Amino acid sequence: MSTLFWILLVVAALIGGIAIGFFIARKYMMNYLEQNPPINEDMIRTLMMQMGQKPSQKKVNQVMRAMNVQMKNEKKS
């Protein structure tokens, strides 16, 4: 009987640890994305206007493509 109790206790602790870890990781990622939002097209347009450039859709697409390529290269390294 005590062996079955210990097995159930270990399984319950494992499931509890996984659940708690999931919620901690979720909260961490939500805080991270709130503090460091991903860059989108509107942010690039605003940045170009602040620099005195006229943000055409072609330029915005070029910058987005260049940033995506750079992010992929950084992930591979």
Swiss-Prot record:
<dbReference type="Pfam" id="PF03672">
    <property type="entry name" value="UPF0154"/>
</dbReference>
<dbReference type="InterPro" id="IPR005359">
    <property type="entry name" value="UPF0154"/>
</dbReference>
<keyword id="KW-1133">Transmembrane helix</keyword>
<keyword id="KW-0812">Transmembrane</keyword>
<dbReference type="GO" id="GO:0005886">
    <property type="term" value="C:plasma membrane"/>
</dbReference>
<keyword id="KW-0472">Membrane</keyword>
<protein>
    <recommendedName>
        <fullName>UPF0154 protein EAT1b_0403</fullName>
    </recommendedName>
</protein>
<keyword id="KW-1003">Cell membrane</keyword>
<feature type="transmembrane region" description="Helical">
    <location>
        <begin position="4"/>
        <end position="24"/>
    </location>
</feature>
<comment type="similarity">
    <text>Belongs to the UPF0154 family.</text>
</comment>
